[in-house]
Amino acid sequence: MNVKPKLPKGFRDFDSKTLEKREYIIKIISDVFKSYSFQKIETPSVESIETLSGKYGDEADRLIFKILNSGNYLSDYDLNNNADYKELTRFISKKALRYDLTVPLARYISQNINNISFPFKRYQIQNVWRADKPQKGRFREFMQCDADIIGSKNLINEYELVRIYDKVFEKLNLPGTIISINSRKILTAVSTKLNVEDKFSEFVNLLDKYDKIGKINFIEELKNFNISKEDSDFLIKIIENPDIDYIKSYLSEFGISSEGFDECKYIFEKLKLTSNFCEIKFNFKLARGLDYYTGTIFEVENSKVKIGALGGGGRYDNLTSIFGNNELSGVGISFGLDRIYYCLSELSLFKSSNELNKTLFLNFGERELNYNLKVLDVFRDSGISATI
């Protein structure tokens, strides 16, 4: 029987021209990482379920690609008995494809902690998998390009990671790039004022959807949190006109403070000392959904191409504690290669591709062939691409 060749939804092949453009982006990113003294590591595509589960929040946990165990593990179960399914679930899968590169990094550090010098500056460029609904710019297999600094709480690390973002997009010459900065601590302080601490995850997820659902729908959904009209008006004001000093002053009237304000201001003060290619701004409604961020959070978008985040990251103080290391604080960023590729393509910013074969030797006979074979080696040994 003939099988129709097709790919599963959300997965792709890449031809040589596409790969050449992707490798152009990867080289720029990795070169910038190296210039900031980051070391490259790699981790396996497969991690244990217990390593990944519970680190990303309930919504993200559902997107983890689980791998069925091998063997005839169904032989002892009555598949017609619904009661067996609950018992069976925990035996079906004990491994999964990695969802991101950060949690595997925490596992890697915990396993190799005695062989690592801290602060540990690592970068990693590998594929990740998410069982998400495929759409424009969103795939089930895609490459992440991460840089993390582990073992230091110094805010200069946040500054350097923002500079890495800025430097990469400058080298890519991608106009309209916006780097947004916020703090999970500021969001926590605001949620305290609004009395929604017990629904913090739901609150920040709604905040993160503000641009997508619009002001009217946002206000309507706020009613689910029993927020007063006064507090609702305050929230809309700081969403539309975010100012760190205003938010800090307002909350202080109620005895609520947060070091997140001072941390963000420190980063912006340091960024004023440099010439920045990207627009860098404070964005109160930035509330990245991953549960492990505890401090500063970042996100990168492009105003000229609407495709979502080109990158993101933040500070995570407790991630390695799940593996028994309580003192390790970390901060990291990630580049979304596919979306960056899409932006460069949409804006026609890729340089014209050089021909793969820069030198062509013609064969007019056996004598000429013998001569060409010798000269071909000379060209190739000199780094010049050639074919016959």
Residue positions per predicted region:
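Short, surface-exposed recognition loops or helix-turn segments adjacent to catalytic cores
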Residues: G176-I186, F203, K281-A287
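N-terminal targeting/leader regions
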Residues: N2-D15, S201-Y250
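Proline- and acidic/polar-enriched loop/turn elements at helix boundaries
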Residues: S45-V46, I181, F203, F234
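TRNA-binding/sensing appendages of the translation machinery
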Residues: M1-Y99, V103, Y159-R163, S180
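Terminal amphipathic helices with adjacent charged low-complexity linkers/tails
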Residues: I186-T188, N195
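Positively charged, Gly/Ser-enriched RNA/tRNA-binding surfaces
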Residues: K21-S37, E47-S48, A83-I92, D100-N114, ...
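Acidic, His- and aromatic-enriched active-site or binding-groove loops in soluble protein domains
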Residues: A60-D76, N195-L222, N302-S303
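Short low-complexity, flexible loop/linker segments enriched in glycine and/or proline
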Residues: K55-E59, K193-N195, T296-F298
